[in-house]
């Protein structure tokens, strides 16, 4: 899954945070 650097979509907040932390 190629998620955007900034999670602004009402998708999974958990995955969003994980991606942000990974970045």
UniProtKB/Swiss-Prot annotation:
Q: What is its main location?
A: secreted
The UniProt site entry described as Reactive bond for chymotrypsin is assigned to 17-18
An MF annotation (GO) of this entry = serine-type endopeptidase inhibitor activity
Known tissue expression: Expressed by the venom gland.
Occurrences of domain BPTI/Kunitz inhibitor (ranges): 7-23
Keywords, alphabetical: Disulfide bond, Protease inhibitor, Secreted, Serine protease inhibitor
The answer on whether this UniProt entry bears the keyword Secreted reads: yes
Instruction: Tell me which GO cellular component terms the UniProt record holds.
Output: extracellular region
For the keyword Disulfide bond, the answer is: yes
* Protein localization: Secreted
Report the protein's function: Serine protease inhibitor that inhibits chymotrypsin.
Query: What family name appears in the similarity comment?
Result: Belongs to the venom Kunitz-type family.
What is the protein name given in its UniProt record?
Kunitz-type serine protease inhibitor C8
Query: What are the top taxonomic ranks of the organism?
Result: Eukaryota, Metazoa, Chordata, Craniata, Vertebrata
């Amino acid at each position: 899954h190629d998620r955007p650097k900034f999670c602004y979509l009402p998708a999974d907040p958990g995955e969003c945070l994980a991606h942000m932390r990974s970045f």
